[in-house]
Amino acid sequence: MKSFTATALAALLAQQAAAHSTFQQLWVDGTDFGSQCARLPQSNSPITNYNSNDMRCNIIGTRPQVKCPVRAGGTVTVEMHAQNGDRSCSQEAIGGAHHGPVSVYLTKVSDALTADGSTGWFKIFDDGWRKNPSGRVGDDDFWGTKDLNACCGKMNVKIPSDIPSGDYLLRAEAIALHAAGGAGGAQPYMTCYQITVSGGGSASPPTVSIPGHFKASDPGVQVNIHGAMTNYVIPGPAVYAGGSTKVAGSACSGCEATCAVGSSPTTSLTPPVSTSTPAPGNGGGGSPGGCTVQKYGQCGGQGYTGCTTCAAGSTCNTTNQWYHQCV
């Protein structure tokens, strides 16, 4: 019995670890920008302290030196996968029955390269929950994360047409609720993208602070999805009037359905020139434009398109074929 229990526990832990994920790539009106403007997290683990400033943009491993150009009224497509640099559809974007809502926020900043996310945030997108008439419990119902899995990790998000032009952080968040029956059990996964919006208006959406956009005791955060459900309240504020929502369980559309790696030429962005020391052994011969990766950030790997030069005092180490890290 002890042997069985230990084996089952080990299998469960392995499944949970494999199910961890990160938002990694960004498409803009169908153009693939890869991870160039994504503040890639150090790991694919969730943030468990809801009061931490890490709730804003995660524990950042790679801070890019570029911003993705986005037009007001356009559509961006965030992309999530389990392993860094792995954009295949052979495994779920967020597996292990990690069901829950997906939300996207914006915050207006003076410079997306240096902003810390302490400015006010407003929600521009939700994909939450819908009852499955054929299901018995919440696990069987339709969820935002299931839509991510159905669309190879992609989720279309409309940029409001009336927000002011300028720099923003765009924050994608998925909340896994498989262990949310007790306080603190919900698992938020988030990534921030650095963008510059053009052609905007003069709207001033109401904002909330992050951390603080939800509490551990909120009904959409502490919830048992393993029993029958009759309703669900998505955590955080309401979606701004100029934003959009997706009905959970609806079909993939637009870029969700048609955008695949190689279907659109990846647009390369030019970062500001900086002085850096090339990192040996990364196979890239240095980074384009002179950008640098801070210690413990990603510097290479299959499918990776960001900076490959480590900051002085660290070198690019090959962890596996998908992930090289400055150490």
UniProtKB/Swiss-Prot annotation:
Any one biological process term the GO annotation gives: cellulose catabolic process
Catalysed reactions, semicolon-separated: [(1->4)-beta-D-glucosyl]n+m + reduced acceptor + O2 = 4-dehydro-beta-D-glucosyl-[(1->4)-beta-D-glucosyl]n-1 + [(1->4)-beta-D-glucosyl]m + acceptor + H2O
Compartments, record wording: Secreted
Pfam families: AA9, CBM_1
Positions of the UniProt region annotated as Disordered: 264-284
UniProt cross-references to InterPro entries, sorted A to Z: AA9, AA9_LPMO, CBD_sf, Cellulose-bd_dom_fun
Keywords for this protein: Carbohydrate metabolism, Cellulose degradation, Copper, Disulfide bond, Glycoprotein, Metal-binding, Monooxygenase, Oxidoreductase, Polysaccharide degradation, Secreted, Signal
Cofactor(s) demanded: Cu(2+)
Enzyme class label: oxidoreductase
Cystine crosslinks: C68-C192
Record carries keyword Cytoplasm: no
Uses, biotech or industry: Lignocellulose is the most abundant polymeric composite on Earth and is a recalcitrant but promising renewable substrate for industrial biotechnology applications. Together with cellobiose dehydrogenases (CDHs) an enzymatic system capable of oxidative cellulose cleavage is formed, which increases the efficiency of cellulases and put LPMOs at focus of biofuel research.
Annotated CBM1 domain residues: 291-327
Recorded domain comment: Has a modular structure: an endo-beta-1,4-glucanase catalytic module at the N-terminus, a linker rich in serines and threonines, and a C-terminal carbohydrate-binding module (CBM). The CBM domain is essential for binding to and subsequent oxidative degradation of polysaccharide substrate.
Functional summary from the UniProt entry: Lytic polysaccharide monooxygenase (LPMO) that depolymerizes crystalline and amorphous polysaccharides via the oxidation of scissile alpha- or beta-(1-4)-glycosidic bonds, yielding C1 or C4 oxidation products. Catalysis by LPMOs requires the reduction of the active-site copper from Cu(II) to Cu(I) by a reducing agent and H(2)O(2) or O(2) as a cosubstrate.
Protein name: AA9 family lytic polysaccharide monooxygenase B
Annotated organism of origin: Podospora anserina (strain S / ATCC MYA-4624 / DSM 980 / FGSC 10383) (Pleurage anserina)
Lineage: Eukaryota, Fungi, Dikarya, Ascomycota, Pezizomycotina
This protein's encoding gene: LPMO9B
